[in-house]
Amino acid sequence: MSAKTDEILDSLKSLSLLEASELVKQIEEAFGVSAAASAGVVMAAPGAAAGGDGADAAEEKTEFEVVLESFEASSKIKVLKEVRNATGLGLGEAKALVEAAPKTIKEGATKEDAEALKKAIEAVGGKVTLK
């Protein structure tokens, strides 16, 4: 990397969470982009690539889709926290995702990660399927 990009990276590493959030908002406004939309596109890409190998995927699946099917109303906040932890989404995006169940919450996950996420969400009252 160049000295300039190294310097920028070092500056970003020193930002507090609040400063990083403000920076994201400023970048979204300045460039007319949305961080949430690009995260969704990035998350969708591995799943799309896995779907292209129909014959290989039938033999042994290596990437999984974690789908939140439903949740107990009394456990909504706990499920929301688990979804946020797994996806890195903000509160608003995670809330919209949970309320839109059934909805894919993670794509391209390894078998171990998918099963761990399923177990964590089911432990707090959610119903999850792996595809």
UniProtKB/Swiss-Prot annotation:
Keyword Kinase belongs to the record: no
Keyword Ribonucleoprotein in annotation: yes
GO biological process: translation
Domain of life: Bacteria
NCBIfam families recorded: L12
Function in brief: Forms part of the ribosomal stalk which helps the ribosome interact with GTP-bound translation factors. Is thus essential for accurate translation.
Family: Belongs to the bacterial ribosomal protein bL12 family.
Protein name: Large ribosomal subunit protein bL12
Organism, scientific name: Prochlorococcus marinus (strain NATL2A)
